[in-house]
Amino acid sequence: MKKILLLIALSYFCGIAAQAQTELLKNPSFEEEAKPIRNRRFGPNGEGELFGGRLPEGIIPGWIIPKGTEKSSKIAVSTEDLLDTTQQKALCWNITEASEAAPATIANVGIHGIETVKGREYTFTFWARADKRYKGKISVGLQSKSTDGTWYAEATAKGKIKKRWKKYTVTFTAEGDAPNARLVITANQPGTLYLDCVSLTAN
């Protein structure tokens, strides 16, 4: 019973309850537990390697670091200085290398891929905070999962990412069609970012 009440509280706080039918992301509040995988490749695009019943560091259900950007940053679950007492986890994104030309990148593959429709507007909301090293911005968009990396939409969150939790909202319009795109978040400077209660919906 306590677990059910906690999940209800989490859904209410993150705004997921009202968007349950339209939420496009998998594990948007980072509360989902990772499960060990035996004799299979982890990740929707074959990322990772074969495991013997254990998970490597940085595995968070629904979230990946795209190929080619693995050396620039790492992701992990954080349980400290959380957004609210109802939250048990947040995403810690430790960025060691990043610039405007070569930003650090993380992606969410959606529940069954993210359908992108040309001309449709999407809204991305998220809570974020940063350590004192991070002076950059956060950009977000929809990108092809194929090797060509086609961008269907992209926008940058307004305002600096501060030391205290703050909510940000980004809207963008898709410029192409894709049955199974992914949400991509980019950061253009080194530092540590914390994200929680993210949400992507189609308007």
Where are these regions (language model features)?
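Extracellular and organelle-lumenal recognition/adhesion modules and their flexible linkers in secreted
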Residues: I4, Q21-N203
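Bacterial Sec-dependent N-terminal signal peptides
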Residues: M1-T22
